[in-house]
Amino acid sequence: MKKLFILAGPTAVGKTDISIEVAKKIDGEIISADSMQIYKYMNIGSAKITKGEMQEIPHYLIDIIDPKENFNVSRYKNLAEKTIEDIYSRNKFPMLVGGTGLYINSLICNYDFTDAKVDVNYRNYLENLAKVQGREYVHSLLKDIDAVSYERLYPNDLKRVVRALEVHKLTGKTIGEFNSKDSLYDIPYKIYYFVLNMDRVKLYERINKRVDLMIEQGLIDEVKNLRSMGYTKDMQSMKGIGYKELIRYLEGDISLDEAVYLIKKGSRNYAKRQLTWFRKDERVIWVNKDEFTSNKEIVNYIINTLVTC
Protein backbone atom coordinates (compact mmCIF):
# COMPACT_ATOMS: atom_id res chain seq x y z
CA MET A 1 0.00 0.00 0.00
CA LYS A 2 1.29 3.46 -0.89
CA LYS A 3 2.39 5.70 1.96
CA LEU A 4 1.06 9.19 2.65
CA PHE A 5 2.53 11.48 5.30
CA ILE A 6 0.30 14.15 6.84
CA LEU A 7 1.28 17.07 9.03
CA ALA A 8 -1.65 19.14 10.19
CA GLY A 9 -2.48 21.52 13.01
CA PRO A 10 -4.10 24.83 13.82
CA THR A 11 -3.12 28.09 12.19
CA ALA A 12 0.19 29.57 13.42
CA VAL A 13 1.28 26.42 15.27
CA GLY A 14 4.43 26.14 13.13
CA LYS A 15 3.75 23.47 10.52
CA THR A 16 5.90 24.97 7.78
CA ASP A 17 9.35 24.79 9.39
CA ILE A 18 8.81 21.27 10.69
CA SER A 19 7.44 20.01 7.37
CA ILE A 20 10.52 21.27 5.52
CA GLU A 21 12.90 19.47 7.88
CA VAL A 22 10.88 16.25 7.71
CA ALA A 23 10.84 16.47 3.89
CA LYS A 24 14.63 16.69 3.83
CA LYS A 25 14.93 13.50 5.86
CA ILE A 26 12.37 11.35 4.04
CA ASP A 27 12.94 12.65 0.49
CA GLY A 28 9.47 14.16 0.57
CA GLU A 29 7.55 16.58 -1.61
CA ILE A 30 4.82 18.72 -0.10
CA ILE A 31 1.20 19.09 -1.17
CA SER A 32 -0.53 22.04 0.47
CA ALA A 33 -3.80 21.36 2.28
CA ASP A 34 -4.73 25.00 2.75
CA SER A 35 -7.93 26.49 1.35
CA MET A 36 -6.45 30.01 1.06
CA GLN A 37 -2.89 29.34 -0.12
CA ILE A 38 -4.31 27.77 -3.25
CA TYR A 39 -5.24 31.25 -4.53
CA LYS A 40 -2.95 33.51 -6.54
CA TYR A 41 -2.07 37.01 -5.29
CA MET A 42 -3.27 36.28 -1.74
CA ASN A 43 0.13 35.90 -0.12
CA ILE A 44 0.32 37.80 3.14
CA GLY A 45 -3.17 37.07 4.43
CA SER A 46 -2.81 33.34 3.78
CA ALA A 47 0.70 33.20 5.31
CA LYS A 48 1.78 31.62 2.04
CA ILE A 49 5.17 29.96 2.10
CA THR A 50 7.86 31.84 0.14
CA LYS A 51 10.35 30.36 -2.32
CA GLY A 52 13.11 30.95 0.20
CA GLU A 53 11.22 29.19 2.97
CA MET A 54 10.68 26.17 0.70
CA GLN A 55 14.46 25.51 0.73
CA GLU A 56 14.18 23.81 -2.66
CA ILE A 57 11.61 21.29 -1.40
CA PRO A 58 8.95 20.99 -4.15
CA HIS A 59 5.53 22.34 -3.13
CA TYR A 60 2.23 21.80 -4.93
CA LEU A 61 -1.31 23.21 -4.95
CA ILE A 62 -0.12 26.67 -3.95
CA ASP A 63 -0.77 29.78 -6.04
CA ILE A 64 -2.72 27.99 -8.78
CA ILE A 65 -6.32 29.28 -8.65
CA ASP A 66 -7.52 32.75 -9.65
CA PRO A 67 -9.35 34.41 -6.73
CA LYS A 68 -12.44 34.95 -8.87
CA GLU A 69 -12.95 31.18 -9.15
CA ASN A 70 -15.08 29.19 -6.75
CA PHE A 71 -12.92 26.30 -5.58
CA ASN A 72 -14.28 23.29 -3.73
CA VAL A 73 -13.11 20.15 -1.98
CA SER A 74 -14.02 17.94 -4.93
CA ARG A 75 -11.63 19.85 -7.20
CA TYR A 76 -8.99 19.76 -4.49
CA LYS A 77 -9.27 15.99 -4.12
CA ASN A 78 -8.91 15.51 -7.87
CA LEU A 79 -5.82 17.74 -8.11
CA ALA A 80 -4.22 16.27 -4.98
CA GLU A 81 -4.67 12.66 -6.09
CA LYS A 82 -2.99 13.41 -9.43
CA THR A 83 -0.15 15.15 -7.60
CA ILE A 84 0.31 12.23 -5.22
CA GLU A 85 0.60 9.82 -8.15
CA ASP A 86 3.12 12.12 -9.84
CA ILE A 87 5.23 12.19 -6.67
CA TYR A 88 5.06 8.38 -6.40
CA SER A 89 6.16 8.06 -10.03
CA ARG A 90 9.45 9.72 -9.09
CA ASN A 91 9.91 7.52 -6.01
CA LYS A 92 9.43 10.43 -3.64
CA PHE A 93 7.37 10.52 -0.43
CA PRO A 94 4.14 12.57 -0.74
CA MET A 95 3.51 14.85 2.23
CA LEU A 96 0.17 16.52 2.86
CA VAL A 97 0.71 19.66 4.95
CA GLY A 98 -1.87 22.19 6.09
CA GLY A 99 -4.76 23.04 8.32
CA THR A 100 -7.86 22.62 6.17
CA GLY A 101 -9.35 19.48 7.66
CA LEU A 102 -11.89 18.90 4.92
CA TYR A 103 -9.16 18.92 2.27
CA ILE A 104 -7.17 16.38 4.27
CA ASN A 105 -10.20 14.18 4.86
CA SER A 106 -11.05 14.18 1.16
CA LEU A 107 -7.92 12.08 0.68
CA ILE A 108 -7.82 9.98 3.84
CA CYS A 109 -11.53 9.24 4.20
CA ASN A 110 -13.65 7.38 1.69
CA TYR A 111 -15.74 10.36 0.66
CA ASP A 112 -17.66 10.26 -2.60
CA PHE A 113 -17.95 13.71 -4.17
CA THR A 114 -19.78 12.53 -7.25
CA ASP A 115 -23.51 12.16 -7.71
CA ALA A 116 -23.18 8.38 -7.64
CA LYS A 117 -24.64 8.16 -4.14
CA VAL A 118 -27.65 10.32 -4.96
CA ASP A 119 -30.73 9.27 -6.90
CA VAL A 120 -32.93 12.34 -7.22
CA ASN A 121 -35.65 10.54 -9.16
CA TYR A 122 -35.95 7.77 -6.57
CA ARG A 123 -35.90 10.32 -3.78
CA ASN A 124 -38.73 12.29 -5.42
CA TYR A 125 -40.65 9.06 -5.97
CA LEU A 126 -40.46 8.18 -2.27
CA GLU A 127 -41.46 11.68 -1.20
CA ASN A 128 -44.49 11.58 -3.51
CA LEU A 129 -45.30 8.09 -2.26
CA ALA A 130 -45.36 9.46 1.29
CA LYS A 131 -47.89 12.08 0.23
CA VAL A 132 -50.14 9.50 -1.44
CA GLN A 133 -49.86 6.46 0.85
CA GLY A 134 -48.50 8.06 4.00
CA ARG A 135 -45.16 8.29 5.76
CA GLU A 136 -45.86 5.10 7.68
CA TYR A 137 -45.97 3.16 4.41
CA VAL A 138 -42.63 4.55 3.20
CA HIS A 139 -41.16 3.81 6.63
CA SER A 140 -42.40 0.20 6.38
CA LEU A 141 -40.28 -0.31 3.25
CA LEU A 142 -37.22 -0.31 5.50
CA LYS A 143 -38.35 -3.35 7.49
CA ASP A 144 -37.03 -6.06 5.17
CA ILE A 145 -33.88 -4.28 3.95
CA ASP A 146 -32.63 -2.30 6.96
CA ALA A 147 -34.18 -3.52 10.20
CA VAL A 148 -31.90 -1.35 12.33
CA SER A 149 -33.02 1.86 10.63
CA TYR A 150 -36.61 0.64 10.67
CA GLU A 151 -36.45 0.38 14.47
CA ARG A 152 -34.37 3.51 14.98
CA LEU A 153 -36.18 5.98 12.72
CA TYR A 154 -39.67 7.32 13.20
CA PRO A 155 -42.07 7.50 10.22
CA ASN A 156 -42.21 11.29 10.59
CA ASP A 157 -38.44 11.51 10.09
CA LEU A 158 -39.07 11.24 6.37
CA LYS A 159 -35.78 12.78 5.24
CA ARG A 160 -33.68 10.13 7.02
CA VAL A 161 -36.05 7.32 6.06
CA VAL A 162 -35.78 8.31 2.40
CA ARG A 163 -31.98 8.58 2.64
CA ALA A 164 -31.73 5.08 4.14
CA LEU A 165 -33.86 3.65 1.33
CA GLU A 166 -31.88 5.58 -1.27
CA VAL A 167 -28.52 4.34 0.02
CA HIS A 168 -29.72 0.73 -0.02
CA LYS A 169 -30.99 1.07 -3.59
CA LEU A 170 -27.70 2.54 -4.78
CA THR A 171 -25.21 0.47 -2.78
CA GLY A 172 -27.00 -2.59 -1.45
CA LYS A 173 -25.81 -1.53 2.02
CA THR A 174 -27.71 -0.38 5.05
CA ILE A 175 -27.12 3.23 6.03
CA GLY A 176 -25.16 1.94 9.04
CA GLU A 177 -22.86 -0.13 6.84
CA PHE A 178 -22.49 2.75 4.39
CA ASN A 179 -21.43 5.17 7.14
CA SER A 180 -19.27 2.74 9.10
CA LYS A 181 -15.69 3.60 10.01
CA ASP A 182 -14.46 0.53 8.17
CA SER A 183 -15.96 1.95 5.00
CA LEU A 184 -14.89 5.50 5.82
CA TYR A 185 -11.24 4.49 6.26
CA ASP A 186 -11.14 2.21 3.21
CA ILE A 187 -8.54 4.24 1.31
CA PRO A 188 -5.62 3.36 -0.99
CA TYR A 189 -2.97 4.81 1.34
CA LYS A 190 -1.15 3.82 4.48
CA ILE A 191 -1.25 7.12 6.33
CA TYR A 192 1.08 8.62 8.92
CA TYR A 193 -1.07 11.38 10.38
CA PHE A 194 0.64 13.85 12.72
CA VAL A 195 -1.09 16.88 14.21
CA LEU A 196 0.86 19.62 15.97
CA ASN A 197 -0.60 21.28 19.03
CA MET A 198 0.56 23.49 21.88
CA ASP A 199 -0.73 25.25 24.97
CA ARG A 200 -3.77 27.27 23.90
CA VAL A 201 -2.62 30.50 25.55
CA LYS A 202 0.72 30.26 23.72
CA LEU A 203 -1.03 29.43 20.45
CA TYR A 204 -3.33 32.43 20.75
CA GLU A 205 -0.31 34.66 21.47
CA ARG A 206 1.34 33.36 18.29
CA ILE A 207 -1.84 34.03 16.32
CA ASN A 208 -2.07 37.61 17.61
CA LYS A 209 1.58 38.27 16.78
CA ARG A 210 1.17 36.77 13.32
CA VAL A 211 -1.74 39.11 12.57
CA ASP A 212 0.30 42.12 13.71
CA LEU A 213 3.14 40.96 11.46
CA MET A 214 0.78 40.59 8.49
CA ILE A 215 -0.34 44.19 8.92
CA GLU A 216 3.32 45.30 9.11
CA GLN A 217 4.16 43.28 5.99
CA GLY A 218 1.50 45.09 3.96
CA LEU A 219 -1.74 43.13 4.18
CA ILE A 220 -3.78 46.31 3.75
CA ASP A 221 -2.01 47.07 0.47
CA GLU A 222 -2.52 43.47 -0.62
CA VAL A 223 -6.27 43.82 -0.11
CA LYS A 224 -6.27 47.18 -1.90
CA ASN A 225 -4.44 45.60 -4.83
CA LEU A 226 -6.89 42.70 -5.01
CA ARG A 227 -9.82 45.13 -5.10
CA SER A 228 -8.13 47.17 -7.84
CA MET A 229 -7.84 43.94 -9.86
CA GLY A 230 -11.60 43.51 -9.68
CA TYR A 231 -11.89 41.00 -6.86
CA THR A 232 -14.91 41.76 -4.69
CA LYS A 233 -16.15 40.91 -1.21
CA ASP A 234 -18.78 38.59 -2.68
CA MET A 235 -16.14 36.19 -4.02
CA GLN A 236 -15.35 33.06 -2.03
CA SER A 237 -11.65 33.90 -1.80
CA MET A 238 -12.27 37.39 -0.42
CA LYS A 239 -14.36 36.00 2.42
CA GLY A 240 -11.25 34.55 4.03
CA ILE A 241 -10.12 35.73 7.46
CA GLY A 242 -8.03 38.88 7.11
CA TYR A 243 -9.52 39.86 3.78
CA LYS A 244 -13.18 40.31 4.69
CA GLU A 245 -12.32 42.41 7.76
CA LEU A 246 -9.97 44.73 5.88
CA ILE A 247 -12.52 45.18 3.11
CA ARG A 248 -14.92 46.45 5.76
CA TYR A 249 -12.18 48.82 6.96
CA LEU A 250 -11.49 50.09 3.44
CA GLU A 251 -15.21 50.62 2.89
CA GLY A 252 -15.35 52.77 6.02
CA ASP A 253 -17.54 50.35 7.92
CA ILE A 254 -15.09 49.81 10.80
CA SER A 255 -11.81 51.29 12.04
CA LEU A 256 -8.43 49.66 11.45
CA ASP A 257 -8.18 48.75 15.14
CA GLU A 258 -11.57 47.05 14.93
CA ALA A 259 -10.52 45.19 11.78
CA VAL A 260 -7.32 43.92 13.40
CA TYR A 261 -9.27 42.88 16.50
CA LEU A 262 -11.74 40.93 14.37
CA ILE A 263 -8.95 39.24 12.38
CA LYS A 264 -7.29 38.08 15.59
CA LYS A 265 -10.59 36.90 17.05
CA GLY A 266 -11.57 35.11 13.83
CA SER A 267 -8.17 33.43 13.61
CA ARG A 268 -8.34 32.21 17.21
CA ASN A 269 -11.83 30.83 16.69
CA TYR A 270 -10.67 29.14 13.50
CA ALA A 271 -7.78 27.48 15.37
CA LYS A 272 -10.25 26.18 17.94
CA ARG A 273 -12.45 24.70 15.20
CA GLN A 274 -9.43 23.12 13.52
CA LEU A 275 -8.43 21.32 16.71
CA THR A 276 -11.99 20.11 17.24
CA TRP A 277 -11.95 18.71 13.70
CA PHE A 278 -8.64 16.87 14.09
CA ARG A 279 -9.71 15.34 17.41
CA LYS A 280 -12.47 13.45 15.62
CA ASP A 281 -9.97 11.22 13.79
CA GLU A 282 -8.67 8.34 15.90
CA ARG A 283 -5.75 7.81 13.51
CA VAL A 284 -4.06 11.05 14.53
CA ILE A 285 -0.69 10.99 16.28
CA TRP A 286 -0.67 14.12 18.42
CA VAL A 287 2.55 16.08 18.79
CA ASN A 288 2.47 18.55 21.69
CA LYS A 289 5.17 21.10 20.96
CA ASP A 290 5.40 22.03 24.65
CA GLU A 291 6.88 18.60 25.37
CA PHE A 292 9.91 19.30 23.16
CA THR A 293 12.71 21.84 23.51
CA SER A 294 13.24 22.43 19.78
CA ASN A 295 11.88 21.76 16.32
CA LYS A 296 14.82 19.40 15.80
CA GLU A 297 13.53 17.20 18.62
CA ILE A 298 10.04 17.23 17.10
CA VAL A 299 11.39 16.25 13.69
CA ASN A 300 13.42 13.40 15.22
CA TYR A 301 10.33 12.19 17.09
CA ILE A 302 8.30 12.19 13.87
CA ILE A 303 11.02 10.34 11.94
CA ASN A 304 11.43 7.74 14.70
CA THR A 305 7.67 7.23 14.79
CA LEU A 306 7.59 6.76 11.02
CA VAL A 307 10.22 4.05 11.29
CA THR A 308 8.30 2.12 13.94
CA CYS A 309 4.81 2.45 12.41
From Swiss-Prot:
Region (Interaction with substrate tRNA): 34-37
Database matches in Gene3D superfamilies: 1.10.20.140, P-loop containing nucleotide triphosphate hydrolases (3.40.50.300)
GO BP, sorted A to Z: tRNA modification
Record carries keyword Aminoacyl-tRNA synthetase: no
EC number, as in UniProt: 2.5.1.75
Catalytic reaction equation(s): adenosine(37) in tRNA + dimethylallyl diphosphate = N(6)-dimethylallyladenosine(37) in tRNA + diphosphate
GO molecular function, one term: ATP binding
Cofactor(s) it depends on: Mg(2+)
Marked site (Interaction with substrate tRNA) residue numbers: 100, 123
Amino acids binding ATP: 9-16
Pfam families: IPPT
Binding site for substrate: 11-16
Keyword Membrane applies: no
Keyword terms: ATP-binding, Magnesium, Nucleotide-binding, Transferase, tRNA processing
Similarity comment text for this entry: Belongs to the IPP transferase family.
Subunit comment: Monomer.
Function: Catalyzes the transfer of a dimethylallyl group onto the adenine at position 37 in tRNAs that read codons beginning with uridine, leading to the formation of N6-(dimethylallyl)adenosine (i(6)A).
NCBIfam families in alphabetical order: miaA
PANTHER family, sorted: TRNA DIMETHYLALLYLTRANSFERASE
UniProt protein name: tRNA dimethylallyltransferase
Native organism: Clostridium kluyveri (strain ATCC 8527 / DSM 555 / NBRC 12016 / NCIMB 10680 / K1)
The gene coding this protein: miaA
